[in-house]
């Protein structure tokens, strides 16, 4: 029996805890949080809890939270406030907070939110059944936020209904300590999963009908597996040693992106998708230095050129922070120029939000909110205009689309191209899980429309 199965079977199953009660989990933040929520549901189902979509029907409510920016932190406190009225009507209702806010704000949550029964950190998801059992036994104000310092990272993928495409964690935490980022403090130091655990997960998922996996981590490129295996080696192993049809990965750090990885992607282009999410965060070298990103503007562009040379059809997306402390109008123009020079298909942009524990939160040259918001709107305007022009080149082309599901709003089939474009077309549900050729008839930045051929 392998370690993965042993780890899962070590979870004590006690149906008397759940007793068929409803559990509702509210999820904010990144794909890592979405994966964590799946794990929570799977663990609680083992205790005879039943997932519900309406919190009013739940006996257990968990908020799986994000603290990368200030707004989702405020949403947690607001959401707890809405549930306290439900708890007054039903004293048996249990409320827990996990995720990055649970890790970061545990003391303040316990101090200011008396309706919360328990708080757990990002490394303590597997302690959830025990916390819940104690809570339903009458214990209150429980906290478990200890970081697990064992290495490597031994948690298997738990997905209840994986569908056609799903995610597989390969790393956890981050050692980069960008001055704006709270992740090292909420997710801990970087750990990598053993290679064979990852491969076993993917093989199990393929048996359940999964066609595409995305290898997931805060910085997948810094993966350090057993026997000196790096991320490029891992990617090659997934391509050669599993039957999964499509492979993606996210997120990459520009400082760690190398020629070896490009070569592996080119060698296995039949499986590894031609899409890379490569955050540049700011277009100014001065700002990048203050962010502790460990690359310059020129070095980022050199990596883009290296990737495009080896993968001519590659599509890029990126993350951008606008209004970082000390950012001048000239610095911001460098960011706008970077967007148009690279021609990103998609951008995920936010105004800078000071986070606890981070170095940048202590910088004295913070920008006013109105300046940050104005620059963010300008960035969106520039990218939108560029994106509308760029996508026209796809009209009339044929794309290989992995059909994932039915678009609920329009009744059409939808899936993803190799370049991660969302494509809608007329078809039937029996196409789900198949890769079909679709001719693009109309292209918009957010979605393409086409006809199956």
UniProtKB/Swiss-Prot annotation:
Cofactor(s) needed for function: [4Fe-4S] cluster
Location in or out of the cell: Cytoplasm
UniProt keyword annotations, A-Z: 4Fe-4S, Cytoplasm, Iron, Iron-sulfur, Metal-binding, S-adenosyl-L-methionine, Transferase, tRNA processing
Chief location of this protein within or outside the cell: cytoplasm
All copies of domain TRAM, residue ranges: 392-453
Residues at which [4Fe-4S] cluster 2 binds: 174, 178, 181
Residues bound to [4Fe-4S] cluster 1: 30, 66, 100
Enzyme class: transferase
Cofactor: record remark: Binds 2 [4Fe-4S] clusters. One cluster is coordinated with 3 cysteines and an exchangeable S-adenosyl-L-methionine.
Disulfide bonds: none
GO molecular function terms listed in the Swiss-Prot or TrEMBL record: 4 iron, 4 sulfur cluster binding; metal ion binding; N6-isopentenyladenosine methylthiotransferase activity
Reactions the enzyme catalyzes: N(6)-dimethylallyladenosine(37) in tRNA + (sulfur carrier)-SH + AH2 + 2 S-adenosyl-L-methionine = 2-methylsulfanyl-N(6)-dimethylallyladenosine(37) in tRNA + (sulfur carrier)-H + 5'-deoxyadenosine + L-methionine + A + S-adenosyl-L-homocysteine + 2 H(+)
Pfam families: Radical_SAM, TRAM, UPF0004
Domain Radical SAM core, chain residue ranges per copy: 160-389
Gene Ontology terms: cellular component: cytosol
Family of this protein: Belongs to the methylthiotransferase family. MiaB subfamily.
Function: Catalyzes the methylthiolation of N6-(dimethylallyl)adenosine (i(6)A), leading to the formation of 2-methylthio-N6-(dimethylallyl)adenosine (ms(2)i(6)A) at position 37 in tRNAs that read codons beginning with uridine.
PANTHER family, per the entry: CDK5 REGULATORY SUBUNIT-ASSOCIATED PROTEIN 1, MITOCHONDRIAL TRNA METHYLTHIOTRANSFERASE CDK5RAP1
Name by which UniProt lists this protein: tRNA-2-methylthio-N(6)-dimethylallyladenosine synthase
Record gene name: miaB
């Amino acid at each position: 029996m392998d370690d993965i199965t042993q780890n899962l079977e070590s979870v004590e199953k006690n149906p008397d805890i759940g007793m068929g009660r409803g559990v509702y989990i509210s999820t904010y933040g990144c794909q890592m949080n979405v994966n964590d929520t799946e794990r929570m549901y799977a663990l609680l189902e083992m205790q005879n809890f039943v997932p519900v979509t309406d919190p009013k029907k739940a006996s257990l409510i968990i908020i799986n939270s994000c603290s990368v920016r200030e707004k989702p932190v405020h949403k947690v406190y607001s959401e707890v406030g809405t549930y306290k009225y439900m708890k007054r009507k039903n004293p048996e209702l249990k409320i827990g907070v996990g995720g990055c806010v649970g890790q970061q704000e545990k003391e303040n949550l316990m101090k200011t939110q008396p309706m919360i029964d328990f708080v757990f950190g990002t490394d303590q998801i597997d302690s959830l059944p025990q916390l819940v059992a104690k809570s339903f036994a009458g214990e209150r104000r429980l906290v478990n936020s200890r970081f697990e310092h064992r290495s490597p990272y031994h948690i298997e993928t738990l997905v209840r209904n994986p569908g056609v495409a799903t995610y597989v964690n390969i790393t956890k935490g981050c050692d980069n300590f960008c001055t704006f980022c709270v992740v090292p403090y909420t997710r801990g130091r970087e750990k990598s999963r053993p290679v064979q655990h990852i491969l076993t997960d993917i093989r199990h998922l393929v048996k359940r009908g999964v066609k595409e996996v995305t290898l997931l981590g805060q910085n997948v490129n810094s993966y350090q597996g057993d026997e000196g295996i790096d991320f490029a080696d891992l990617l090659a192993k997934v391509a050669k040693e599993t039957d999964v049809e499509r492979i993606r990965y996210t997120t990459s750090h520009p400082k760690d992106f190398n020629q070896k990885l490009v070569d592996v992607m080119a060698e296995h282009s039949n499986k590894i998708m031609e899409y890379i999410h490569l955050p540049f965060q700011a277009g100014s070298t001065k700002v990048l230095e203050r962010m502790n990103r460990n690359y310059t503007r020129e070095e980022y562009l050199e990596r883009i050129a290296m990737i495009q040379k080896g993968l001519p059809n590659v599509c890029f997306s990126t993350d951008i922070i606008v209004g970082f402390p000390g950012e001048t109008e000239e610095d911001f123009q460098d960011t706008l120029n970077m967007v148009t020079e690279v021609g990103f298909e998609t951008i995920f942009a936010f105004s800078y939000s000071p986070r606890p524990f981070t170095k940048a939160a202590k910088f004295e040259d913070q920008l006013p909110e109105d300046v940050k918001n104005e620059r963010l709107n300008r960035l969106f305007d520039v990218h939108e205009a560029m994106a509308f022009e760029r996508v026209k080149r796809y009209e009339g082309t044929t794309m290989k689309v992995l059909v994932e599901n039915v678009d609920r709003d329009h009744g059409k089939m939808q899936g993803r191209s190799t370049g991660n474009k969302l494509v809608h077309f007329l078809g039937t549900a029996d196409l789900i899980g198949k890769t079909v050729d679709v001719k693009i008839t109309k292209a918009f930045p957010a979605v393409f429309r086409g006809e199956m051929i």
